[in-house]
């Protein structure tokens, strides 16, 4: 069966067409900078690839462009949209409503919309992608795969906040966790590599960042909480912050709640500390002596190291730490900064192995390291396709 995977972000669309269960990628690509005159469009098959700059004003135009590329007489990979059995959509927040992959109905869309308040950078964009895909790929099943689903196994002592019970029971305020599709995929890869039930910390570092403690394949704790704003220092998100700062900004500094929300989600993190949100720029400026960039990198690494310690305690031991996503897979500098002087935990990084670039799972620890240090490229699109296939087959 042919399954189209769509990851619709606030200003981008990632897509991949796969044949399941053969795990064959027919084509993949991305449209980013949607809404600008200089939208970047990529399309790649086994035998062909191209990139072009075109104005893509809306997600609807973008998804129509994806369909046109798939159907193109010369470079396309399908003859009609009816060849696609299902469209799998990544959805960041499923709240307490969705603990499993779900066929999308009008009721499901209403719930995703309702949860947009908790994931304002993500859920609205996912809804746009779903609505447009329903029009363009009308004969296909539309299926949602939720980032929060993997974290439904977190025990109550870890997911419950120390607040009045009515907020949990009536308003479902709790730790939900995010990046679950990625954490699930890379933890399974690591477990297969280690060939045993294991205690693993997965570290997803991209523009958004999160960590998860995984015991025998199940999430038992994670850094993101009620929303994707919590936890580690991120590209534009502050991560952990004393809630009193929010009250201070509103009561004493005169900001509205919406303004505070915008500051903490879109103007904070590495951007707020340095003026840059892209780690490549920050690393470059730090190497040139920029003190703000140097400090921001140290702050980022410190919070990750501190979390490794707390999760090792929660797991009662540690077999491996796993780096993944754009920064985790590609920044040898950050991996080294995080893992240096962690020998107390039995973590010793091999600086030469750490420099090696590869698209395969690789081990970058020294022979003496008690804890394995793995770099595992994530493949959220494959994980989504696999979950969609399993749902429809069963």
Swiss-Prot record:
CC cofactor note: Mg(2+). Can also accept Mn(2+).
Cellular component, GO, one term: cytoplasm
GO biological process, one term: acetate metabolic process
Molecular function terms, GO-annotated: acetate kinase activity; ATP binding; magnesium ion binding
Superkingdom as given in the UniProt entry: Bacteria
Residues where Mg(2+) binds: 7, 380
Keywords: ATP-binding, Cytoplasm, Kinase, Magnesium, Metal-binding, Nucleotide-binding, Transferase
UniProt protein name: Acetate kinase
Entry similarity comment: Belongs to the acetokinase family.
Lineage: Bacteria, Pseudomonadati, Bacteroidota, Flavobacteriia, Flavobacteriales
Catalytic reactions on record: acetate + ATP = acetyl phosphate + ADP
Gene source species: Flavobacterium johnsoniae (strain ATCC 17061 / DSM 2064 / JCM 8514 / BCRC 14874 / CCUG 350202 / NBRC 14942 / NCIMB 11054 / UW101) (Cytophaga johnsonae)
Entry's localization field: Cytoplasm
Subunit structure: Homodimer.
Gene3D superfamilies per UniProt: 3.30.420.40
